Design a protein with these regions (language model features):
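Sec-exported extracytoplasmic/periplasmic mature domains
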Residues: 18, 25-29, 71-74, 118-126, ...
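Solvent-exposed loop/turn segments at secondary-structure junctions
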Residues: 13, 19-22, 39-42, 64, ...
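Structured C-terminal subdomain patch of bacterial secreted/periplasmic proteins
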Residues: 104-132, 209-285
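Basic- and aromatic-lined ligand-binding clefts that recognize polyanionic substrates
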Residues: 12-18, 22-25, 124-177
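A short, structured surface patch at a secondary-structure boundary
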Residues: 1-83
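Second-shell loop/turn segments in exported
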Residues: 3, 9-12, 23, 54-60, ...
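Extracytoplasmic ligand-binding site segments that recognize negatively charged/polar headgroups
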Residues: 20, 29, 36-47, 85-88, ...
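His/Asp/Glu-enriched short active-site or ligand-binding loop at hydrolase and phosphoryl-transfer sites
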Residues: 170-190, 208-211, 239-243
Length: 285
C-alpha cells in the first residue's frame, strides 16, 4: 500500500471484485461500500440492502469508466490488478489498494490480505486479531508430514480440464491436509485433454473436480463429466466435487482456510463428516 494512500482512510469504498466484499464483511465494513461490480451475484445481506436503498451503486459488470467512479462518491478503491487499469493515475488523490490475493499460493496468504484491507481502512488492530484467529485454527488442523493418498485436482469448464502447477495453492493445502498433490510441470496452469486426464488419474488415489454449475446440486459424476464415466466404471477411485457456483469457494472460503483444510483432511481419511465445500460424487463403482 502506498505510503500516501495510508494517510487517508476512505469512508466510502468502491470494489472491483465481489471477492473483496468478504474481507469487508469480516471487518463489519460493508456500510462503507458505495459501488460494486456484479451486485446481483452477492449473498451479503447488508450490501444487497444498500443496493436496494440506492446507497451502493451496482455496476453489474466490470466495464466501469473513470466517470462512473467519479460520480459514485467513492473515496477509496480496492482494485483488481489483472484488469490492467491504473485507477491511481485517474485519481491521484484517492487511496487505491491493488488486491493481489489471487496470486497467493498459501491458503493463509489469501486470508492475510484481511490485514492489508484493515490497514487501508483504519482497522489494523481488528484485522490483525481476526487473522490470528484464522491462522491459529488453520495450524491446529495442519498435518505435519504429507503422505498418501495422491490427489488430482482438475478444474472442468464443460469442454476442457485445467490443472494447476506442482507449486500452487492446491499443493500447499493438500500437503497440509496429509495428501500429495499431482500437479503439472512449470509455474503456470495447463489445459489437459481427455487422454492426459486419464493418464493423470491412473496415478491418483483421489480425484477432485472443481467446476461451476449454477443451481446444480446433483452430484453424479456421470452427469457432471460424461467423458470420464466409462473410466470410473472400471477404475475404482475416490471422487469428490467442488461446485464453486454454489458453495462460496471464491468468496467466504478465502477467509475460511481452516475449514477447507479440515474438510480435505477428513476427505483424505475417508470420513463421512458433513462438508461445506466438497461433496462426494456418485460414480458407477
Amino acid at each position: 500500500i502506498q505510503r500516501e494512500s495510508c494517510k487517508k482512510k476512505p469512508q466510502n469504498l468502491a470494489v472491483f471484485s465481489t471477492t473483496h466484499i468478504h474481507y469487508l464483511s469480516q471487518l463489519n465494513l460493508q456500510n462503507t461500500l458505495v459501488a460494486t461490480v456484479y451486485g446481483s451475484r452477492l449473498d451479503d445481506s447488508v450490501v444487497r440492502e444498500r443496493i436496494r436503498n440506492n446507497q451502493c451503486v451496482n455496476w453489474e459488470n466490470a466495464e466501469v469508466s473513470k466517470e462512473q467512479v467519479a460520480v459514485s462518491g467513492a473515496q477509496g478503491i480496492l482494485s483488481l490488478p489483472y484488469e490492467g487499469r491504473n485507477w491511481k493515475s485517474f485519481f491521484p488523490e484517492m487511496p487505491v489498494l491493488p488486491m493481489f490475493e489471487y496470486e497467493e499460493q498459501h491458503p493463509l496468504g489469501r486470508a492475510e490480505w484481511l490485514v492489508a484491507v484493515g490497514f487501508f481502512m483504519g482497522k489494523s488492530k481488528q484485522s490483525i486479531e481476526a487473522f490470528k484467529q484464522i491462522e491459529n485454527k488453520y495450524m491446529s488442523h495442519k498435518v505435519e508430514q504429507a503422505s498418501q493418498p495422491k490427489v488430482a485436482v482438475l478444474a472442468y469448464s464443460g469442454s476442457a480440464w485445467t490443472i494447476a502447477p506442482s507449486q500452487s495453492f492446491w499443493s500447499v493445502l493438500l500437503a497440509n491436509a496429509g495428501g500429495t498433490y499431482l500437479g503439472c510441470e512449470g509455474d503456470k496452469s495447463q489445459e489437459y485433454d481427455t487422454e492426459q486426464v486419464i493418464e493423470l488419474l491412473n496415478q491418483a488415489d483421489v480425484y477432485l473436480e472443481v467446476n461451476y454449475r449454477e443451481g446444480d446440486t446433483h452430484f453424479d459424476l456421470n452427469v457432471l463429466n460424461p467423458k470420464l464415466s466409462a473410466y470410473f466404471q472400471t477404475n475404482k477411485k475416490t471422487v469428490f466435487g467442488c461446485n464453486t457456483a454454489m458453495n462460496g469457494f471464491f468468496g467466504p472460503a478465502l477467509l475460511e482456510p481452516d475449514v477447507l483444510l479440515l474438510e480435505l483432511k477428513n476427505l483424505l481419511s475417508n470420513s463421512n463428516s458433513e462438508s461445506k465445500y466438497f461433496q462426494k460424487l456418485n460414480s458407477a463403482n
